[in-house]
């Protein structure tokens, strides 16, 4: 049993949307195929992943360091104790050989994307959906049957009107979502408040709204937005400041009583531990941590991050992985987390879930396909198959 090849391709997202900090006109993502010599149903088992969204393709680092380390290792050293499947933890350790501590983002996304693709192969070899494999290893065998999903929407778009924004949110509600998120910080405060008011007007009483500032604000603007947003009773106010400015985040937390959310731009367990130690976040007020596993060294390291925040008194229900894709869905279901993000209608083939996915009252039933389940996304799977051909 061995990995015979690992391939990467950079794919443009071709999107004209923007948040408060940048647009996605140049954004790319790395698609990875981990090709094994294991055969199932007459075909080699291939693990797939991509590096989520919001960070550019990272194939150069993969090809220069991480892929050669895996392919150059003794194949038996990459297997589990009974030599019946690959061991993602051992493969992660091989990729980390001769790597200096710190500087995580330079490598965490490249490593994490390959590692998640390995997990896809592991689950396929076990003939189980990944969420079930993860539940067995990391959640006492308690496998969820459905996951709460919210929409990461409300992006700024060219010539968008407030009515356009309301119409978008109505579509999400009609599709079965009960929580939606929108961007703030890309317009003057008064205009953003009008946008928030407009969305709140169309939400039913049992629906929730969150806002995302994408780390845009310095101190004065962050506190001004916190004051203006306080009356709306938001599910959370996301990334109000630089992701590593824990002192400012703690000040905002003292000033803003409703929940805060952050973490998608933290790429190591140590960064997340520093967040919960020094960032002033409050598990008793439903604050949320949003690490993106493929961008933060993968699932093995994410399990270590989960264990770390649990030691600091955080429940798993406070964890909502960033990403809006099948990977975060499987991880949320397997670990028993609070929920997953969704990107309907944006990022082309890379947004959303399986073609037959249907939400009911905010929840998405988990599939039974072996692996992550990319095979259920026809447009994305065709891209992956072309890479592996």
Roles of regions detected by a PLM:
Residues 227, 233, 244-370:
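Shared catalytic-loop signature of beta/alpha-barrel
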Residues 32, 44, 66, 114, ...:
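Conserved, mostly hydrophobic/aromatic
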Residues 135-256:
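Metal-dependent enolase-superfamily TIM-barrel catalytic cores that perform enediolate-based chemistry
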Residues 371-389:
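Extended hydrophobic packing segments that form well-structured cores
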Residues 39-126:
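Metal- or metallocofactor-binding catalytic centers and their adjacent structured scaffolds
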Residues 105, 109, 115-158:
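Glycine-rich, aromatic-flanked loop segments that form ligand/cofactor-binding clefts
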Residues 1-59, 65, 350:
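Structured beta-strand/loop patches that form or line metal/cofactor-binding pockets in enzymes
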């Amino acid at each position: 049993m061995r990995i015979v090849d690992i391939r990467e391709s950079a794919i443009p997202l071709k999107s004209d949307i923007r948040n408060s900090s940048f647009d996605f006109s140049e954004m790319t993502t790395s698609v990875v195929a981990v090709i094994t010599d294991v055969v199932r149903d007459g075909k080699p088992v291939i693990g797939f992943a991509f590096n989520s969204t919001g960070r550019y393709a990272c194939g150069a680092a993969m090809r220069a360091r991480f892929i050669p380390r895996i392919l150059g290792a003794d194949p038996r050293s990459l297997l589990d104790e009974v030599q019946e499947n690959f061991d993602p933890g051992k493969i992660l350790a091989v990729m980390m050989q001769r790597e200096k501590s710190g500087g995580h983002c330079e490598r965490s996304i490249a490593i994490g994307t390959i590692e998640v693709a390995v997990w896809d192969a592991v689950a396929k070899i076990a003939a189980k959906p990944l969420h079930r494999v993860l539940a067995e290893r990391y959640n006492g065998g308690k496998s969820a049957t459905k996951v709460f999903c919210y929409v990461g929407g409300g992006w700024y778009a060219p010539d968008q009107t407030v009515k356009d924004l309301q119409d978008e949110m109505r579509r999400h509600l009609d599709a079965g979502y009960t929580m939606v998120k929108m961007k703030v910080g890309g317009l003057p405060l008064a205009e953003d408040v009008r946008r928030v008011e407009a969305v709140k007007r169309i939400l039913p009483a049992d629906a929730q709204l969150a806002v995302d500032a994408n780390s845009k604000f310095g101190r004065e603007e962050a506190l001004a937005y916190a004051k203006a947003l306080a009356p709306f009773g938001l599910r959370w106010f996301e990334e109000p400041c630089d992701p590593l400015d824990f002192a400012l985040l703690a000040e905002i937390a003292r000033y803003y009583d409703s929940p805060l959310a952050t973490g998608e731009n933290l790429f190591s367990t140590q960064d997340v531990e520093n967040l919960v130690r020094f960032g002033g976040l409050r598990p008793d007020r439903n604050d949320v941590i949003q690490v993106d596993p493929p961008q933060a060294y993968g699932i093995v390291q994410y399990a270590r991050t989960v264990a770390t925040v649990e030691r600091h008194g955080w429940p798993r229900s406070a964890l909502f992985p960033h990403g809006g894709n099948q990977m975060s869905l499987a991880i949320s279901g397997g670990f028993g987390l609070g929920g997953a993000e969704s990107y309907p209608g944006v990022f082309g083939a890379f947004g959303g879930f399986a073609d037959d996915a249907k939400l009911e009252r905010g929840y998405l039933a988990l599939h039974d396909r072996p692996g992550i389940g990319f095979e259920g996304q026809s447009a994305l799977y065709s891209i992956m198959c072309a890479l592996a051909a």
